[in-house]
């Protein structure tokens, strides 16, 4: 069971989490025009668009044929999270009258692709944006929702305005204690060990592993940090860093049986110290606080990982918290 926010959904009316019963009020398709294609995923094609009524830029996510229930889930989750810190805003839901293909209309974020952007970051930028991402994660977890697909591709950053948005809630799900969830979620490089060993009773802490994998790639300048060629190889790549003895301790604790395919590929590995990943190119991002923070995220045992709220209180973010306090103080000065 999750260490935090375990009973959020059971304390809410059924209509909050029972997405099957959601009623979609469709907007007017003709209010939107496609400008250009900006991306595609497994479940959708994404376009920059324009609202022809008010000439506001927007993002149009055209959903590929998928179960109605999945579409309802994404919409319900976005509605429940509306107005939360750094959560992408769902503006409208429309559908084509002929094909019945639904599209989700979102706020536009002037994103720079992470492979271009992250190398430009300084140490403070990394701290700042990870802190902004933690705000979104703590908020969604506090609302009883796991994102289940945290990765750089789903974190939009408008660097000029220092604005971050967590996007793509298509795999997100409501957390109910004791429920067994599908382990075929998240993207390979960001899958937590629980998914790779087929442990289905996972919780919000899955998102904290994904955040840790993302953070490791940012501070060590190694993208992705765990570079598996398949799901089984992904666990091997993790074990080469965190150690096999530690993996078996985790499996024993939760009485998890490892799939027989691992017999041939796992081997035995000593835990690698985090400092061994430091080199001339990445040392400016790495501090004792950064390593301590990373170490408290990338744990096999999901119950040992920091929660999003605990993470925000970590000393690594002291400069970010100080800056925010200073900004509030200065804003107060200008008002008075």
Curated annotation (Swiss-Prot):
<dbReference type="GO" id="GO:0004674">
    <property type="term" value="F:protein serine/threonine kinase activity"/>
</dbReference>
<dbReference type="GO" id="GO:0005524">
    <property type="term" value="F:ATP binding"/>
</dbReference>
<dbReference type="GO" id="GO:0006974">
    <property type="term" value="P:DNA damage response"/>
</dbReference>
<dbReference type="InterPro" id="IPR000719">
    <property type="entry name" value="Prot_kinase_dom"/>
</dbReference>
<feature type="binding site">
    <location>
        <begin position="38"/>
        <end position="46"/>
    </location>
    <ligand>
        <name>ATP</name>
    </ligand>
</feature>
<dbReference type="InterPro" id="IPR008271">
    <property type="entry name" value="Ser/Thr_kinase_AS"/>
</dbReference>
<keyword id="KW-0723">Serine/threonine-protein kinase</keyword>
<comment type="function">
    <text>Catalytic subunit of a constitutively active serine/threonine-protein kinase complex that phosphorylates a large number of substrates containing acidic residues C-terminal to the phosphorylated serine or threonine. Phosphorylates the frq clock protein thus regulating the circadian clock.</text>
</comment>
<feature type="binding site">
    <location>
        <position position="61"/>
    </location>
    <ligand>
        <name>ATP</name>
    </ligand>
</feature>
<keyword id="KW-0547">Nucleotide-binding</keyword>
<protein>
    <recommendedName>
        <fullName>Casein kinase II subunit alpha</fullName>
        <ecNumber>2.7.11.1</ecNumber>
    </recommendedName>
</protein>
<dbReference type="InterPro" id="IPR017441">
    <property type="entry name" value="Protein_kinase_ATP_BS"/>
</dbReference>
<comment type="similarity">
    <text>Belongs to the protein kinase superfamily. Ser/Thr protein kinase family. CK2 subfamily.</text>
</comment>
<keyword id="KW-0067">ATP-binding</keyword>
<dbReference type="InterPro" id="IPR045216">
    <property type="entry name" value="CK2_alpha"/>
</dbReference>
<keyword id="KW-0418">Kinase</keyword>
<feature type="domain" description="Protein kinase">
    <location>
        <begin position="32"/>
        <end position="317"/>
    </location>
</feature>
<dbReference type="GO" id="GO:0005634">
    <property type="term" value="C:nucleus"/>
</dbReference>
<dbReference type="Pfam" id="PF00069">
    <property type="entry name" value="Pkinase"/>
</dbReference>
<keyword id="KW-0808">Transferase</keyword>
<dbReference type="GO" id="GO:0005829">
    <property type="term" value="C:cytosol"/>
</dbReference>
<dbReference type="GO" id="GO:0106310">
    <property type="term" value="F:protein serine kinase activity"/>
</dbReference>
<feature type="active site" description="Proton acceptor">
    <location>
        <position position="149"/>
    </location>
</feature>
<dbReference type="InterPro" id="IPR011009">
    <property type="entry name" value="Kinase-like_dom_sf"/>
</dbReference>
<dbReference type="GO" id="GO:0051726">
    <property type="term" value="P:regulation of cell cycle"/>
</dbReference>
<dbReference type="GO" id="GO:0005956">
    <property type="term" value="C:protein kinase CK2 complex"/>
</dbReference>
<comment type="subunit">
    <text>Tetramer composed of two alpha chains, one beta chain and one beta' chain.</text>
</comment>
């Amino acid at each position: 069971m999750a260490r935090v926010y375990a009973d959020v959904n059971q304390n809410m009316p059924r209509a909050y989490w029972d997405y099957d019963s959601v009623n979609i009020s469709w907007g007017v398709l003709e209010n939107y025009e496609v400008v250009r294609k900006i991306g595609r995923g497994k479940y959708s094609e994404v376009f920059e668009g324009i609202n022809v009524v008010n000439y506001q830029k927007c993002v149009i996510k055209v959903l590929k044929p998928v179960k109605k229930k999945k579409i309802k889930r994404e919409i319900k989750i976005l509605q429940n999270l509306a107005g939360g810190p750094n959560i992408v805003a769902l503006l409208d839901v429309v559908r084509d009258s002929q094909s019945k293909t639904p599209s989700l209309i979102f706020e536009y974020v002037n994103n720079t692709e992470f492979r271009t952007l992250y190398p430009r970051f300084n140490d403070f930028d990394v701290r700042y944006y990870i802190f902004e991402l933690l705000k979104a994660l703590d908020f969604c977890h506090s609302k009883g929702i796991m994102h289940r697909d945290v990765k750089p591709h789903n974190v939009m950053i408008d660097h000029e305005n220092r604005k971050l948005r967590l996007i793509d809630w298509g795999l997100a799900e409501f957390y109910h204690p004791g429920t067994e969830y599908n382990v075929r979620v998240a993207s390979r490089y960001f899958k937590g060990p629980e998914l790779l060993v087929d442990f289905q009773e996972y919780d919000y802490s899955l998102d904290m592993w994904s955040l840790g994998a993302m953070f490791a790639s940012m501070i060590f300048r190694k993208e992705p940090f765990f570079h598996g060629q398949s799901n089984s190889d992904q666990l091997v790549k993790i074990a080469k860093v965190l150690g096999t003895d530690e993996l078996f301790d985790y499996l024993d604790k939760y009485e998890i049986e490892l799939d027989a395919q691992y017999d041939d590929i796992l081997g035995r590995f000593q835990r690698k110290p985090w400092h061994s990943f430091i080199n001339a190119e990445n040392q400016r991002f790495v501090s004792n606080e950064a390593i301590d923070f990373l170490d408290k995220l990338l744990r096999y045992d999901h119950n040992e990982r920091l929660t999003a709220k605990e993470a925000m209180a970590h000393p690594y973010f002291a400069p970010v918290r100080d800056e925010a306090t200073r900004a509030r103080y200065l804003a107060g000065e200008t008002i008075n």
